[in-house]
Amino acid sequence: MQSSLAVNEKVEILAEALPYIRRFHNKTIVIKYGGNAMTEEILKQSFAKDVVLLKLVGMNPVIVHGGGPQIDSMLKRVGKEGVFIQGMRVTDAETMDIVEMILGGLINKEIVNLINRHGGQAVGLTGKDGMFIRAKRMLIKDKEDAEKWINIGQVGEIEYIDPSLIKLLDARDFIPVIAPIGVGEEGESYNINADLVAGRLAETLKAEKLILMTNTPGVLDKNGNLLTGLTASRVDELFADGTISGGMLPKIKSALDAVKNGVKSCHIIDGRVQHALLLEILTDEGVGTLIKSEG
């Protein structure tokens, strides 16, 4: 027999979730899925259950996934090493083939299958399907020479996202699972950072929330302390003083652009915590770092 205390605690948890379920009913929540949550079995299972539950209580989760560690593993198997500049993967033609194989094939279908096994109806896509993510080659500015631009290969900069396909799937109660691969004017493939795709998609869909899952508790200051709440202006300061760097750069850029362009809030959460999505969306305290526009 469970103790009455344990039962009461469960009831309180359910009661705490009720106002959030009501508030976010029929709202779109874009989730960037990555990090340890994609590789550890217990975290994969809890993620899938969370997504299905969000859908069942009336929210519209849209998943954008990464796959960096899996891509790196395959590159090593073929004798190549991953190279990053300012948090972006340098992508030559051979690397692009591997990216498409891993992201659009192996990982995407694994996530779809996982969600479906837990009672959801997930559909896997890349941005090439219906050409719904149009992209062009990205050039990045050299930190040492402001007038110099660096070509990092088939890395895409988003030009346009057509939301009609995603809205159609949402309306039919499917859960879109999107690999961040875009398509150019000539049909060429582009590897796009998953954080940037998630942010731009959240803007396009006018999402209530953007959630980025990471391998850290959230945004940390220079002493390693968690910053639980940030405004857009404070984020700009952290960019300027170098607190935000490396792989966190595209995440924060995605979050900042999203909240400046109509997304109500962005949450950077620790994907290593079981049921992190539910803790963030359905509890009073939440987890991780909340980023909002001014005010």
UniProtKB/Swiss-Prot annotation:
Main location (coarse class): cytoplasm
Keyword match Transferase: yes
Reactions mediated catalytically: N-acetyl-L-glutamate + ATP = N-acetyl-L-glutamyl 5-phosphate + ADP
Superkingdom of origin: Bacteria
Location of the protein in the cell: Cytoplasm
Pathway participation: Amino-acid biosynthesis; L-arginine biosynthesis; N(2)-acetyl-L-ornithine from L-glutamate: step 2/4
Name of the featured protein: Acetylglutamate kinase
Organism of this sequence: Nitrosomonas eutropha (strain DSM 101675 / C91 / Nm57)
Highest classification ranks of the organism: Bacteria, Pseudomonadati, Pseudomonadota, Betaproteobacteria, Nitrosomonadales
